[in-house]
Every structure is written in structure tokens, then in C-alpha cells.
Amino acid sequence: MNLFDFFRGRQKQTSASVAKERLQIIVAHERGQRSTPDYLPALQKELVEVIRKYVNIGNDDVQVALENQGSCSILELNITLPER
């Protein structure tokens, strides 16, 4: 590092370094999304089909979430049932 660079302050980031940072953010986001199992959407669809045999509900009335807490996985199922 040159003494003059120190007094000039921080130089602008190059477009390559900005692109690299953005790509790292995107990759980290994609890896985070990959943690959910692939079968979750199919499970939700099948649950809606089974519940529809008995109750009139829409596709958005069933929410399925999978949570990992240490060595334990928790499957949370929320069903909004219509009024009678």
C-alpha cells in the first residue's frame, strides 16, 4: 500500500468485485432455499386432495412448513377450515 493511497481514502470497487459480491449473495440465498426437501410441494398437494374428500377447501388453505431444531425436524401443518 502506497502512502498516498492511504490519504486518498478507499478506492472505488471494480465492477468485477461488485459482481463477485452479488453472486456470492445469490449463491448463499439459493443454498438456504435448498435446505427444504423436494417432497414438500407434493406433500402439500396430496394433503389438499385428501382433505377435499371431506371438506371444501382451496389450495391456499393448507400451509406446510419444515423446521430443523438441532437433530430434530418438525413438520408444521396449518389448515384453514371453512365455517359451517
Curated annotation (Swiss-Prot):
The keyword Transmembrane does not apply. SUPFAM superfamilies: Cell division protein MinE topological specificity domain (SSF55229). Disulfide bonds: none annotated. GO terms for biological process: cell division; regulation of division septum assembly. It holds the Pfam family MinE. It comes from the Bacteria. InterPro entries: MinE, MinE_sf. Keywords: Cell cycle, Cell division. HAMAP family: MinE. NCBIfam families: minE, PRK00296.1, PRK13989.1. Belongs to the MinE family. Prevents the cell division inhibition by proteins MinC and MinD at internal division sites while permitting inhibition at polar sites. This ensures cell division at the proper site by restricting the formation of a division septum at the midpoint of the long axis of the cell. This is Cell division topological specificity factor. It comes from Pseudomonas entomophila (strain L48). The gene is minE.
